[in-house]
From Swiss-Prot:
<dbReference type="InterPro" id="IPR000026">
    <property type="entry name" value="N1-like"/>
</dbReference>
<dbReference type="GO" id="GO:0016829">
    <property type="term" value="F:lyase activity"/>
</dbReference>
<keyword id="KW-0255">Endonuclease</keyword>
<keyword id="KW-1015">Disulfide bond</keyword>
<keyword id="KW-0456">Lyase</keyword>
<dbReference type="GO" id="GO:0046589">
    <property type="term" value="F:ribonuclease T1 activity"/>
</dbReference>
<feature type="disulfide bond">
    <location>
        <begin position="5"/>
        <end position="103"/>
    </location>
</feature>
<dbReference type="GO" id="GO:0004521">
    <property type="term" value="F:RNA endonuclease activity"/>
</dbReference>
<dbReference type="InterPro" id="IPR016191">
    <property type="entry name" value="Ribonuclease/ribotoxin"/>
</dbReference>
<dbReference type="Pfam" id="PF00545">
    <property type="entry name" value="Ribonuclease"/>
</dbReference>
<protein>
    <recommendedName>
        <fullName>Guanyl-specific ribonuclease Th1</fullName>
        <ecNumber>4.6.1.24</ecNumber>
    </recommendedName>
</protein>
<keyword id="KW-0540">Nuclease</keyword>
<keyword id="KW-0378">Hydrolase</keyword>
<dbReference type="GO" id="GO:0003723">
    <property type="term" value="F:RNA binding"/>
</dbReference>
<dbReference type="InterPro" id="IPR051386">
    <property type="entry name" value="Ribonuclease_N1/T1"/>
</dbReference>
<feature type="disulfide bond">
    <location>
        <begin position="23"/>
        <end position="84"/>
    </location>
</feature>
<feature type="active site" description="Proton donor">
    <location>
        <position position="92"/>
    </location>
</feature>
Length: 106
């Protein structure tokens, strides 16, 4: 999966790295650094996420290309389900308030 969030393009390897990190934290029942990520994503926006079922978890995907380890999460998130399948990539960029919109290509 590749994605474009606002003006930021994420390669398939970047999406994979973020989703793999999220999966490892979910399976371990832990979070990145002192953060709350990954955490349950309630999907108030009603995204369809490739027909996958909840629970969904959101985890930051960083424009720097590094894997999130704590600190500022930025605007973009990879979403996985409980089986660690990539559900989609979403962003606060272009959304109102604390809501999300889908990134292009997802």
């Amino acid at each position: 999966d590749t994605a474009t969030c606002g003006k930021v393009f994420y390669s398939a390897s970047a999406v994979s790295a973020a989703s793999n990190a999220a999966c490892n934290y979910v399976r371990a029942g832990s979070t990145a650094g002192g953060s709350t990520y990954p955490h349950v994503y309630n999907n108030y926006e009603g995204f369809r996420f490739k027909g996958l079922s909840k629970p969904f978890y959101e985890f930051p995907i960083l424009s720097s290309g590094k894997t999130y380890t704590g600190g500022s999460p930025g605007a973009d998130r990879v979403v996985i389900n409980g089986q660690c399948s990539i559900a989609g990539i979403i962003t606060h960029t272009g959304a109102s308030g604390n809501a999300f919109v889908a990134c292009g290509g997802t």
